[in-house]
């Protein structure tokens, strides 16, 4: 999700400055935009978002001035790093992929006012919780069509994990309030 947000943000900012781009770069940016929109559609089954949502999330994450691209070299490098990390990820290493994307420095955190950071954390936790509830609902619907006992056990286990995670997130939200 983070890399999708970054790609959407960069593509949008680059296309706003179309007059500064040569034809080849413009075509690459358009290709990146098309690819990012395809990724948003793929992600939408887990986390329904629009192109605008992805850009807003990246702006919020970075707290950047959207009228300038002063940080373009840093953005480009981070985009390349995330892109390389995505190529190396596999579905079986979710913790590895989480650690790759959680590169928030203490300086970035200290620059966010405490109340605002708390609000951002609560908002994201509530969003995660609602998506987990949707996943739990989808898993409960999936149980109806299962004919294999191994798949049934796996779904029941995943529902339990999902419910326990929801409870932990709700408890965390209550402790932050």
Swiss-Prot record:
Main location as per UniProt: virion
Cellular component terms (Gene Ontology): host cell nucleus; virion component
Keywords annotated in UniProt: Host nucleus, Host-virus interaction, Transport, Virion
Superkingdom of origin organism: Viruses
Keyword flag Transport: yes
Signal peptide: none
Subcellular localization: Virion; Host nucleus
Record motif Nuclear export signal, residues: 91-100, 117-127
Task of the protein: Mediates the nuclear export of encapsidated genomic RNAs (ribonucleoproteins, RNPs). Acts as an adapter between viral RNPs complexes and the nuclear export machinery of the cell. Possesses no intrinsic RNA-binding activity, but includes a C-terminal M1-binding domain. This domain is believed to allow recognition of RNPs to which the M1 protein is bound.
Assembly and interaction partners: Binds M1 protein. May interact with human nucleoporins and exportin XPO1/CRM1.
Protein name in the entry: Nuclear export protein
Organism: Influenza C virus (strain C/Great lakes/1167/1954)
């Amino acid at each position: 999700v983070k890399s999708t947000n970054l790609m959407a943000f960069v593509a949008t900012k680059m296309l706003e400055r179309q007059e500064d781009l040569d034809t080849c770069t413009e075509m690459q940016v358009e290709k990146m935009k098309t690819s990012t929109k395809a990724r948003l559609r793929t992600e939408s089954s887990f986390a329904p978002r629009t192109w605008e949502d992805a850009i807003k999330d990246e702006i919020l994450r970075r707290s950047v001035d959207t009228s300038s691209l002063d940080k373009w070299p840093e953005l480009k490098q981070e985009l390349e790093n995330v892109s390389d990390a995505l190529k190396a990820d596999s579905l079986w290493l979710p913790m590895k992929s989480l650690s790759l994307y959680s590169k928030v420095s203490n300086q970035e955190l200290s620059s966010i006012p405490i109340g605002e950071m708390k609000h951002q954390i609560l908002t994201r936790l509530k969003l995660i919780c609602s998506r987990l509830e949707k996943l739990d609902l989808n898993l409960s619907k999936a149980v109806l069509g299962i004919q294999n006992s191994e798949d049934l056990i796996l779904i029941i286990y995943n529902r339990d994990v999902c419910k326990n995670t929801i409870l932990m997130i709700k408890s965390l939200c209550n402790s932050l309030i």
